[in-house]
Amino acid sequence: MKRLLAACTLGLALTIPAAHADDAHEFGISPQATYELMQERGDEVLFIDVRDPVEIMFVGFTDEVDLNIPFLLVDRHDWDAENNRFRPGRNPEFVAQVDAALEARGLDRDARIITMCRSGSERGEPSARFLRENGFANARYVVNGFQGDTIREGEYAGFRLKNGWQNSGLPWDTRMNPEKIHRSD
């Protein structure tokens, strides 16, 4: 019964066009639906972790992704004093790297592409939107990303414990897969 329900849910998720999805997540997909899609049709999908590899090193990784292609890379020479952090800049090779990853898998720009960042909002959604604007019509992003949203109040305020891939019981590890992680030239 669980398999039938999962198959029906996955089938429904694949048939609903993005235009009919929830306005807040017009082309978002849940972590669970992403996992199920990768299990059922992973050879037809390119699942990309768009975080900077250094972030992955400290936060965790799921080997369910096909590849790490950062959308933004932290520039360790550009300090943002106002926000007390290094400034991230768009990866100038992002589109070319996605094209190469698709080609390596025998896919084209019409394939489903799913991006995932830490929370879904800062890089996941923008990277999927950027891909759509650059000819990848079926790009989506994992809503709430890898770690999810922060808890706003109480003892665990500030912790990312309420949603996202990591908090959904899906496979992840503290170790990275070196075969999938982006390396700078």
Question: Where are the predicted features?
Answer:
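Short, surface-exposed ligand- or partner-binding patches at beta-edge/loop junctions that are enriched
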Residues: M116-C117
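Rhodanese-like catalytic fold shared by cysteine-dependent sulfurtransferases
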Residues: A19-D43, M57-R112, E122-D185
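Catalytic nucleophile-elbow at a beta strand-turn-alpha helix junction centered on a G-D-S/GDSL motif
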Residues: V50, S121-E122
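Positively charged n-region of N-terminal signal peptides that target proteins for export
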Residues: M1-L4
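Bacterial N-terminal signal peptides
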Residues: A6-T15
